[in-house]
Regions:
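Core-facing hydrophobic residues within beta-strands of well-ordered domains
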Residues: 29-32, 190, 237
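Hydrophobic/anchoring residues in structured secondary elements
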Residues: 37, 195, 239-242
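Conserved ATP/PPi-binding loop(s) of AMP-dependent carboxylate-activating enzymes
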Residues: 90, 101-137, 175
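Short proline/glycine- and acidic-rich turn/helix-capping motifs at secondary-structure junctions
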Residues: 240-251
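Acidic/polar alpha-helix N-cap and adjacent early helical turns
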Residues: 261-270
Length: 270
């Protein structure tokens, strides 16, 4: 407000902290015209609230990594929530089968797979220092295997759905936590949500939602909301756990394994 900042480039967690702060007001950020985010996906619910709070001229989703700074960019992120846009300048991105060893076979539009990026980009790294096994796993035939999951829609826009390691396999189905998180994040009583898989003897994993609330809501109400939102039955959470805080790294990334370690026993008891 004092400095009349016109551009913001933050991780989603910092946008959440800003707009949820008691002192936040639209008039205090009226000078901000352009905003961007990177470092983690922004849920549909948070994106809607950020759009309403800042009403920016430009809303950029910058998808990249430390290994290759930019994969794709969407300069109007809120027009299609979840979209990471198209390949950046001098970059090529593909989606290949989850367990692919080569980048030559690509999946069809709307089919989820692993995201890979061309190493010919000027922003690309050459490998991990003194980590030959990690380099061999990530770099194959001139492509960087990101470990991220996603898909291209029919328009050619990339959607990042999570990490290969975070996929929940339940009853033989691969389920992305992000899809479920996006649905629940739009419920007015939900402030933040993280979806994980809990071990289960029958299903392998069951879907559990850890939720920080902004208002009272019951598990049955949330389940009904998932139904009306069109979420398939096998993707709906079997457990809901209401918690005070969601653990995050210093840069705002959700620490799913820390969350599981903190709450797994209680969540499994239901």
């Amino acid at each position: 407000e004092r400095e009349q900042v016109s551009n913001l480039y933050l991780v989603p967690t910092l946008y959440h902290m800003l707009i949820e702060h008691p002192a936040f007001a639209r008039e205090r950020v009226a000078s901000v015209e352009k905003i961007g985010f990177a470092g983690a996906p922004m849920s549909d619910g948070l994106m809607r609230r950020v759009e309403q709070a800042f009403q920016p001229q430009l809303f950029v989703n910058h998808y990249g990594s430390s290994e290759i700074y930019t994969f794709t960019i969407d300069q109007q992120a809120s027009r299609k929530p979840g979209s990471s846009g198209r390949s950046a300048l001098n970059q090529r991105v593909r989606v290949v089968p989850i367990d692919a060893e080569s980048a030559q076979v690509q999946v069809k539009p709307m089919e989820e797979g692993q995201i890979v990026a061309d190493l010919a980009s000027d922003e690309a790294f050459e490998g991990y220092l003194n980590r030959s096994e990690a380099t061999a796993k990530a770099l194959r035939e001139g492509w960087y295997f990101t470990g991220d999951t996603g898909y291209f829609d029919e328009d050619g826009d990339l959607f990042v759905t999570g990490r290969v390691d975070d996929l929940i396999i339940t009853g033989g189905e691969n389920i992305s936590p992000v899809e479920i998180e996006n649905v629940l994040s739009l419920h007015p009583a939900v402030e933040e949500v993280v979806v994980v898989g809990l071990p289960d003897e029958q299903w392998g994993k069951i879907i559990a939602a850890f939720i920080k609330l902004r208002a009272e809501v019951s598990e049955s109400e949330l389940d009904a909301y998932c139904i009306t939102s069109g979420l398939a039955k096998f993707k709906r959470p079997r457990r809901y756990q209401f918690i005070d805080e969601i653990p995050k790294s210093p840069v705002g990334k959700v620490l799913r394994r820390v969350l599981l370690a903190q709450h797994q026993e209680q969540a499994q008891k239901g």
